[in-house]
Swiss-Prot record:
A cellular component annotation (GO) from this entry: plasma membrane
Primary role: A possible function for this protein is to guide the assembly of the membrane sector of the ATPase enzyme complex.
Listed name of the protein: ATP synthase protein I
Record keywords: Cell membrane, CF(0), Hydrogen ion transport, Ion transport, Membrane, Transmembrane, Transmembrane helix, Transport
Species whose genome carries this gene: Nostoc sp. (strain PCC 7120 / SAG 25.82 / UTEX 2576)
Gene behind this protein: atpI
Superkingdom as given in the UniProt entry: Bacteria
């Protein structure tokens, strides 16, 4: 279980760093409004990642399968963005997907580092 918590902390840290870099880049190259929309989506992605981690943590002890209620978070955010004129759907959605970019970075890093003990396990 300790490895799970370390992985979770690493993924959250990478997500937050990536969010900061992309937020500043979007603010510089586009506008503050679009950057804030991205940040809203990225924060929702971090909350989604946290909910997923709690769900996985309970898996096996209390539950037999993962719940689908986490997707309601994204649906509510997209619905809010479509109703409120100040919010834009695309930057919010791309911000939400930041945690997916974190997962891709982690997998590529683990796959190409041959000294990783995770790769030596059968």
């Amino acid at each position: 279980m300790q490895e799970f918590y370390q992985l979770y902390q690493e993924l959250v840290l990478i997500t937050l760093v990536l969010t900061g870099v992309v937020f500043i880049s979007v603010w510089i190259f586009y506008s503050l409004n679009i950057a804030l929309n991205y940040l809203l989506g990225a924060c929702t992605g971090v909350v989604y990642l946290r909910m997923l981690a709690k769900d996985v943590e309970r898996l096996g002890r209390e539950k037999q399968s993962l719940s689908k209620t986490r997707l309601a978070l994204l649906m509510a955010l997209i619905l809010l963005a479509s109703r409120w004129n100040q919010l834009q759907i695309m930057p919010i959605f791309l911000g939400f997907l930041t945690y997916k970019a974190t997962l891709i970075i982690y997998v590529v890093r683990v796959a190409f580092i041959s000294d990783s003990p995770k790769l030596r396990q059968p």
